[in-house]
Curated annotation (Swiss-Prot):
Region (Disordered): 422-442
InterPro entries xref list: DUF5757
Record-linked Pfam families: DUF5757 (PF19061)
Protein name (database record): Uncharacterized protein 041R
Length: 1165
């Protein structure tokens, strides 16, 4: 290993610790006197970084045994701060005590002027010299012992048999000084994800291209890593055949921001192989998202991972672990890493190399072709030379292992019976004899040759211990020896053959369930087991040999009545569009006669190619209803239910007289039959109606496609190539996860109307009564505008509805912000009928025409009908809302306007804290008064108008402050609010003056995803770990859980205590400001102060004055808040007549669920 110190390259042998190496830097000194600039390293990992440019200086060397009478004070002062265990007085005493002219007359007077802390005449020379010599002698003896041990280690000859290393992955880095001192969030804000680099994250924020769903573990790995930016980029060549796991093609990169001393560094983790691009191309893909050009910059290798094979050896893991802990030589070369890294693979030993960050893992494997045992080593080293050094070191460790294995085994045999059985004879360390010609590979070929219709090419993946077929003399010899034999098949399915097993641990031939495409003809296939299936009553062999002949006969009859018929034209057009075909189709519907064509039968036919009678379907439904895992799998699909009633759901699922609700209980079918289900009709793919969306991951199980008809449900299949018409026996009914139709259906399902809510993609809903032909979705993933186009008898043209934020419907997302259809109001009002209750109108000032009609949609959601009706006479009960609101800006920008105003307010508060810290030097009640009176605020109307992009760094002069740090405000009212904010900060201690005075970054600039620059080219969301109960969840403002029919989102938003948020209840037109409190008293004091003084004091411990009364409301799940009244006997009860009657600020109490603590919320009006 090479280390560069003071611009000089030094070689460090493997087996030398970091402390031992530091002794070599100071042969006549001690490591304690070494000064390291800029910081003292702790391990080799610190100094082997290619970007490390540290320097070392020996302080003892400039004061010990000198001739010069002048103490080198300036040279020592330059380095003394980097040696924390040495002080100046000690160096002065050593200088005096060890000086060569110590006995010269006038010595004390000559050196006195250059000394600061020590009087030369008072130095105890003997004591100083003895202490120094003792320390140096101890250092020299340890260095000599290290030399002896290294010589002994070098005398050990490494074992032979290593193969050439196979490169698995490499890590490269490059400096990017153009980033300067930009923070991680600033880098994320300027980065733009691309198709080849679709994922960027920092802290809890995740930035992706539209429609890209990150792997679940990506945010979990990066959300709590401070100060770095993480990327995931495609590391494969274009048009490479996709893997089953779509995320395996992405590899990582990270940007570590720099500072004034060190530039920022980008690190790339690049996999190596025929599928993967060169490191330069991978770096270019990441750099593209950062608008960087890295061409011409050298990529510095930081590490590499290789795989090495050591033939002709075996090892016992516990012996090797003991060796790495206790052997005087091997334990210095490598140390077992079990305390930090537990066994992930049985029989694997992990070792680290002397704190260098380099590791070696040992695992014993068996060659598939030859059957020989070998040791697989996975080496992580700095570079190519490091790999060679670690291979040599591993060879020496294994040589020591070979010499001491029997000794260690004998010791453990005294205490462990299992080891005692292994102790004699020990395992042969070299290659065993050549295998017999009937080895695994030959047997596998023979199986496929003699019974190709039973043993398909993928059979070996399903049966890890394959049998062999015996014939002729070999069969007779096996019978004489009394080996376990099995004849299969027995019922004339094909030629009967005799099977045996040659596996020592699995000597019994038996049968296993067949999951391959030939499972219709062969429900079971041969395999080898450790126990005899013939004597087990519930085994597959017993089921096959003693199965009911009548049942098999009925199964053949059912197969005979399965008919393949063409799909309807609409379904065929949909499937052609999915596959990119214009004509033709290989897909048909499989119909079964004589049995009910229910979803249960359809999935059973697809999985087992056997239909179910009505009685059997009833049994299957009853079994699913009693299966907790099947019912639990339906949970997220049952969010549409207003009440949680598991007993009712079980009755519905298990009752054969109730039609099976496929869209509601399809998860139970997926769980019971271990498959993935897609549902389609003649129009296309069907999304489930769960309000929170169906989280669908890429399929890794067999996939079943169901075609839903008016009164039946049938599976979609691909008949055999020789089928023409009529009954069909074989065919493809379950599709592979990598089949084109499965992949494309998954992509279609995920990409149809991609919408994100709280960082989670939400599939759109289908509306049975609102024929939506287009919609506008805001950046929070909520639909704000619906273009409705009635059909049939009600078809009289399109109209536009602007609604409170709602989940999107299954309709195209409009990219336009203008040109929404308007017309007369009679047709839309007639179509909406009683679902829309008008309550107001807005009239054009210029023309007098009614442009907007406001009201309540479906009794829950505020909506506005856009019209242009010059003749409509409003109902007297309608209120005049003044001029139109939705002329300009357009409705889709409503949320952006809110977040922009909130960001301006937050920036003004931070600038006010910065300004008072600079101008006044303190933040007290007096300094706030002085700051406001002495020009701390400058009223500048229109100064902040139109601002959409904000600078995360303080700037003066700038849009928020003058050159003298006077804060710009649009009016006097805003200045008063800022004074109030400063007064609150002075009381709460949230304005640290020294930090604000020196700060260049605006504190809390990036708090939510809306604080980043928004663009249609990407989406940015906050990742939340629902399992982490300590994480504070952000608040969703203005949320109406409209489809569920609940009064409020349940449970209520969880925020930090004392942080306010907006809250709306379904059916109540007003918006409340809410704040969570730890106690009822705190919430009551906040509500009372708000009602009397007009401000919220936040979370306090104050009590309301005696005699004051604050209303208390209770919120029950599924209902609006209601008043809590005190009866005559002092008990509390809910006033059911007051549901939704919230007219005065008060305290709301609720429980999230049974057993949860009581929550206290102040409702402020």
């Amino acid at each position: 290993m090479r280390v560069v110190v003071n611009a000089k390259a030094l070689e460090v042998p493997v087996g030398m610790s970091f402390t031992e190496w530091t002794r070599t830097l100071s042969p006549g000194s001690s490591p304690r006197f070494l000064a390291w600039n800029p910081v003292r390293p702790r391990t080799f990992k610190d100094v082997t970084d290619p970007f490390w440019n540290g320097k070392v200086f020996d302080l003892l060397g400039v004061v010990n045994g000198k001739d010069d009478l002048l103490f080198p004070a300036s040279e020592i002062q330059e380095w003394l701060e980097y040696a924390p265990n040495v002080d100046l007085a000690e160096l002065e005493r050593i200088f005096v005590a060890t000086h060569r002219h110590r006995g010269m007359m006038g010595f004390a007077a000559a050196v006195q002027d250059s000394l600061v802390h020590v009087d030369p005449d008072s130095v105890d020379v003997t004591r100083v010299k003895d202490g120094l010599h003792k320390e140096l002698d101890e250092h020299a003896s340890k260095a000599a012992a290290t030399d002896v041990r290294l010589k002994r280690l070098r005398s050990v000859k490494p074992v032979d048999g290593f193969s050439d290393p196979v490169l698995i992955r490499t890590v490269f880095s490059v400096t990017v000084p153009e980033f300067g001192d930009r923070t991680a969030y600033e880098i994320v804000d300027s980065a733009v994800p691309t198709g080849s680099c679709p994922y960027i994250s920092a802290g809890p924020f995740v930035k992706t291209i539209p429609g890209f769903k990150p792997a679940p573990e990506w945010p979990a790995q990066t959300a709590h890593a401070e100060g770095a930016v993480f990327f995931k980029a495609d590391a494969e060549f274009p048009d490479t055949k996709p893997l089953k796991d779509m995320y395996r093609k992405y590899s990582g990169a990270a940007v570590v921001p720099g500072d004034v001393t060190y530039p920022a560094v980008i690190t790339f983790d690049v996999p190596q192989g025929s599928r993967h691009v060169p490191p330069e191309d991978f770096a270019a893909r990441v750099a593209e998202s950062l608008s960087l050009d890295l061409r011409g910059r050298p990529l510095v290798e930081m590490g590499r991972v290789v795989s090495v094979r050591l033939d002709g050896m075996r090892f016992r893991p516990y012996v090797l672990t003991d060796l790495l802990v206790s052997d005087p030589d091997a334990s210095h070369v490598m140390q077992t890493d079990e305390l930090n890294r537990a066994h992930k693979i049985k029989g694997t030993v992990y070792a680290q190399v002397c704190g260098t960050g380099q590791t070696v893992s040992f695992q014993e494997k068996t060659d598939e072709d030859s059957g020989e045992a070998y040791i697989s080593l996975r080496v992580r080293a700095r570079d190519r030379k490091g790999v060679e050094e670690l291979m040599e070191a591993a060879g020496r460790v294994m040589a020591i292992y070979s010499r001491r294995e029997s000794e260690i085994v004998s010791f453990y045999a005294l205490y462990d019976k299992t080891v005692a059985k292994e102790a004699a004879p020990p395992r042969p360390p070299r290659k065993s004899k050549a295998p017999e010609p009937t080895g695994d590979k030959a047997d596998r070929k023979l199986l496929r040759t003699l019974a190709p219709d039973i043993f398909l090419p993928t059979y070996s993946r399903k049966c890890l211990h394959m049998p062999v077929i015996l014939r002729g003399a070999e069969l007779e010899d096996a019978r004489k020896k009394g080996l376990n034999l099995m004849d299969f098949p027995l019922f004339g399915e094909s030629e009967r053959l005799t099977y045996a097993c040659k596996h020592p641990q699995h000597p019994y031939p038996g049968l296993r369930a067949n999951l391959l495409p030939n499972k219709a003809k062969y429900p079971f296939v041969p395999c080898c087991y450790s126990k005899d299936q013939a004597v087990r009553p519930n085994s597959k062999w017993t089921a096959y040999t003693t199965g009911n002949a009548e049942a098999r006969r009925q199964g053949r009859i059912r197969e005979g009545v399965m008919q393949a018929e063409p799909l309807p034209e609409g379904a065929l057009i949909f499937l052609r569009r999915v596959l990119g075909q214009e004509t033709g189709s290989k897909f048909f519907a499989l119909r079964t006669t004589g049995v009910p064509e229910t979803p249960v039968n359809a999935v059973h036919v697809a999985v087992f190619q056997r239909s179910l009678t009505a009685e059997e379907q009833a049994e299957e439904r009853a079994a699913m209803a009693l299966d907790p895992s099947a019912m639990g799998a339906c949970a997220q699909e049952l969010y549409v239910e207003p009440d949680v009633d598991w007993d009712r759901w079980r009755r519905e699922m298990g009752d054969p007289n109730v039609p099976f609700n496929l869209l509601k209980y399809f998860r139970a079918l997926e769980t019971r039959y271990d498959c993935d289900i897609y549902i389609m009709d003649n129009k296309g793919i069907i999304h489930t109606k769960a309000v929170r969306g169906r989280l669908r991951y890429r399929s890794r199980r067999p996939t079943v496609i169901l075609h839903l008809r008016e009164e039946s449900c049938v599976p979609v299949m691909t008949p055999p190539s020789d089928w023409t018409r009529g009954p069909v026996r074989n065919g493809i009914l379950t599709f592979s996860p990598i089949d084109p139709i499965t992949v494309k259906l998954h992509d279609l399902y995920q990409d149809s109307r991609p919408v994100y809510v709280d960082g989670v993609r939400v599939p759109p809903l289908r509306s049975d009564w609102l024929p939506c032909s287009g919609q506008v979705v805001d950046r929070a993933g909520k639909a704000r505008v619906f273009v409705v186009t009635p059909t049939g008898k009600m078809s009289r043209g399109s109209f536009t509805l602007v609604t409170w934020p709602m989940p999107p419907l299954a309709a195209p997302i409009l990219r336009t912000d203008t040109g929404f259809p308007r017309g007369r109001s009679d047709s839309p009002l007639s179509f909406l009928g009683s679902r829309f209750v008008p309550s107001g109108y807005r009239r054009s000032v210029e023309t007098g025409a009614i442009r907007e009609i406001t009201g309540i949609l479906d009794g829950a959601c505020e909506a506005c009908l856009l019209t242009h009706d010059p003749v409509l006479v409003p109902d007297p009960s309608w209120s005049d809302g003044g001029p139109p609101v939705y002329e300009d800006p357009v409705p889709s920008r409503a949320l952006e306007g809110f977040t922009g105003a909130e960001k301006k307010a937050r920036m003004l508060v931070e600038y006010a804290k910065k300004a008072i810290s600079i101008r006044e030097g303190s933040c007290t009640q007096e300094s706030v008064r002085s700051f406001a009176a002495n020009g701390g605020f400058v009223v500048s109307p229109g100064a902040l108008d139109g601002m959409k992009v904000f600078n995360p760094r303080f700037e003066a002069p700038g849009p928020f402050a003058e050159a003298d740090w006077a804060v710009k405000v649009p009016d006097v009212k805003t200045a008063r609010r800022l004074v109030y904010a400063l007064r609150v900060a002075s009381v709460n201690g949230t304005c640290p003056v020294q930090e604000y005075a020196s700060a260049s970054l605006v504190p809390n600039f990036y708090k939510t995803s809306t604080d980043f620059v928004q663009s249609p080219a990407y989406t940015i969301n906050v990742w939340r770990n629902d399992l982490d109960q300590s994480a504070v969840k952000k608040t969703r403002r203005a949320v109406v859980d409209w489809e569920r029919g609940l009064a409020v989102p349940w449970p209520l938003p969880e925020t930090e205590l004392g942080f306010s948020y907006s809250l709306r209840f379904a059916g109540i037109s007003r918006t409340f400001m809410a704040m969570n409190h730890p106690t009822w008293e705190s919430a009551a004091f906040a509500a009372l102060t708000w009602a009397k003084s007009g401000y919220c004091p936040g979370v306090t411990s104050n009590q309301i004055p005696e005699g004051e009364k604050v209303p208390t409301y209770a919120c029950v799940k599924g209902m609006k808040p209601a008043k809590v009244l005190e009866s005559g006997d002092g008990t509390l009860k809910l006033d059911k007549s007051s549901y939704g009657d919230v007219r005065v600020s008060g305290v709301m109490i609720y429980r999230a669920s049974e057993g949860k603590p009581m929550q206290y919320v102040s409702l402020l009006m």
